[in-house]
């Protein structure tokens, strides 16, 4: 009985064991349990080993277009015709920087994160930019877009100041104009388009006061009770539920649509003659890129996935999530034991019917056709996509440190060369005087090595655990999930072997005692039967 109690105590602990080495599988298991899927128990979770298709992209819902937050990154360039006006222009630039507390001035890392990604379902909203000499990020086909907004490719916004007092609070014009298919937008008189985030600075140019007559309803994405609205003065989207209060109009500081359109703009500042001469003088212009601040959300452009869109980008993009290729196999089928890279044991190949994870969750990728019934789908995409974003952030930190190292190297080279060349000017410069190569020490190289060493150690640790297989202690815990279904029959057989002889002996003695009792009763009955005894006459 003690062994039986021990098994009953340990069984829940073994069943609740997680896989810390595979966070995506753990997240998938939690999602299956939280959604009440029939595959939440007694199933296999398998990952794809293909490197050609790292995952699948799913579009965000119309409501998420109003809630996902973006951020802007600003860089500026002096006008090449600016001569002798650096001091007043620099003063104006410092004023402009103070006017944008929500803009980050450190440039992000651009480029696609994944390629060969397939978009599942119809994207509710797509944005198309066709700038000349722009950076192509990828193009989605029109067949996968429900509503497509096209940014005006010929618009150039250049702000001119005619009075000195305006320089203390410079303003940019409204975001670029966008066009849309005829019949897509309907005029709606509602105050939801006049809302603005209370936690953000209202001085930024994308928070210009809304025009009450420019609030348009996107008919393809709206229903009777729920509307998706577009404010054309700020390129902002709003989601309105007619049964709830007006506090729904609180939106992120920078909306996705506003950030995508601003990143295609050519923004500049010029001043008139009373400050800098007799004619209109351009001072500087800005390059603004945009990134998604909400973790787990990505720009989906064709088959490429981006975290940031560069300034002057071109292509057709939407926003969404990236989920890894995880498949489900029912637990009533036999699978080959996972080898995890152990080449000493043979691999078993057989045809197995796998079910995609999102199909097992009961989710249909139909977010592009409406705004109702998609909460569970959006939450699932976001949670799975966040695990990928965490890995990307780790690699981005290492790349950022490398970028800082290059900047530091350039600064040291320029500073030392200037100083040494001045001291050795008579000899033609330091390198010519020494007649050898000049070497420099970069003080941030240790950070790069530490980051790379940590990444290599993590990869090495995972590789060691994978090659050891079931021979190590951690691998033994993983094997419990395979042995657990056989625990019940094995325990029953063990109990039968332990207590079977005793039970058999008790049953045998009981049967023998009953047989003896019956035999004794039969003999007594036969000996006590009455007989007809006649008395003798004698």
UniProtKB/Swiss-Prot annotation:
Coiled coil: none annotated. It comes from the Eukaryota. Residues 16-478 are extracellular. Its main location: virion. GO terms for cellular component: plasma membrane. A motif (CKS-17) lies at residues 414-430. A motif (CX6CC) lies at residues 431-439. Glycans are attached at residues 133, 146, 177, 220, 241, 247, 312, 332, 443. Gene3D superfamilies: 1.10.287.210. The CKS-17 immunosuppressive domain is present in many retroviral envelope proteins. As a synthetic peptide, it inhibits immune function in vitro and in vivo. This is Syncytin-2. It comes from Pongo pygmaeus (Bornean orangutan). The gene is ERVFRD-1.
């Amino acid at each position: 009985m003690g062994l039986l109690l021990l098994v009953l105590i340990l069984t829940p602990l073994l069943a609740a064991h997680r896989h810390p080495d595979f966070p995506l599988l753990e997240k998938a298991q939690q999602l299956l349990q939280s959604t009440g899927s029939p595959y939440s128990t007694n199933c296999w979770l398998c990952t794809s080993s293909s490197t050609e298709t790292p995952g699948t992209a799913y579009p965000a819902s119309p409501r998420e277009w109003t809630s996902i937050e973006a951020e802007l990154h600003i860089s500026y360039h002096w006008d090449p015709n600016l001569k002798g006006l650096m001091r007043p222009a620099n003063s104006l630039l410092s004023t402009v920087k103070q006017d944008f507390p929500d803009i980050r001035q450190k440039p992000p890392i651009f480029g696609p994160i994944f390629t060969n990604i397939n978009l599942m379902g119809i994207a509710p909203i797509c944005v198309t930019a066709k700038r000349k000499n722009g950076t192509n990020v990828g193009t989605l086909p029109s067949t996968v877009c429900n509503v497509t907004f096209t940014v005006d490719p010929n618009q150039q916004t250049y702000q001119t100041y005619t009075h000195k007092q305006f320089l203390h609070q410079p303003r940019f014009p409204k975001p670029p104009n966008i066009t849309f298919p005829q019949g897509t937008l309907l005029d709606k008189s509602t105050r939801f388009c006049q809302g603005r985030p209370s936690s953000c600075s209202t001085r930024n140019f994308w928070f210009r006061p809304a025009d009450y007559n420019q609030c348009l309803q996107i008919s393809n994405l709206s229903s009777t009770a729920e509307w998706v609205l577009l404010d054309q003065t700020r390129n902002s989207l709003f989601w309105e539920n007619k049964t709830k209060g007006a506090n729904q109009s609180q939106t992120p500081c920078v909306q996705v649509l506003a950030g995508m359109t601003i990143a295609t703009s050519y923004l500049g500042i010029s001043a008139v003659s009373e400050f800098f001469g007799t004619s209109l003088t351009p001072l500087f212009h800005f390059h603004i890129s945009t990134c998604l601040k909400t973790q787990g959300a990505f720009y989906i452009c064709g088959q490429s996935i981006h975290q940031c869109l560069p300034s002057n980008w071109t292509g057709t993009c939407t926003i969404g999530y990236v989920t890894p290729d995880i498949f489900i196999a029912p637990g009533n089928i036999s699978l080959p034991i996972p080898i995890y890279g152990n080449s000493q044991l043979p691999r078993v190949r057989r045809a197995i019917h796998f079910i995609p994870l999102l199909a097992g969750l009961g989710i249909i990728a139909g977010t592009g056709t409406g705004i109702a019934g998609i909460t569970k789908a959006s939450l699932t995409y976001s949670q799975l996509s966040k695990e990928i974003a965490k890995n990307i952030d780790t690699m981005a930190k290492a790349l950022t440190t490398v970028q800082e190292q290059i900047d530091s190297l350039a600064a040291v080279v320029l500073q030392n060369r200037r100083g040494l060349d001045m001291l050795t000017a008579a000899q033609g410069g330091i390198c010519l005087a020494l007649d050898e190569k000049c070497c420099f020490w970069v003080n941030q190289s240790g950070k790069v090595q530490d980051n790379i060493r940590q990444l290599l150690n993590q990869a090495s640790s995972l590789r060691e655990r994978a090659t050891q297989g079931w021979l190590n202690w951690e691998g033994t815990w993983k094997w419990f999930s395979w042995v657990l279904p056989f625990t019940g029959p094995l325990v029953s057989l063990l109990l039968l072997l332990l207590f079977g002889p005793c039970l058999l002996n008790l049953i045998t003695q009981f049967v023998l005692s009953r047989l003896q009792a019956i035999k004794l009763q039969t003999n007594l009955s036969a000996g006590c039967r009455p007989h007809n005894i006649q008395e003798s006459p004698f």
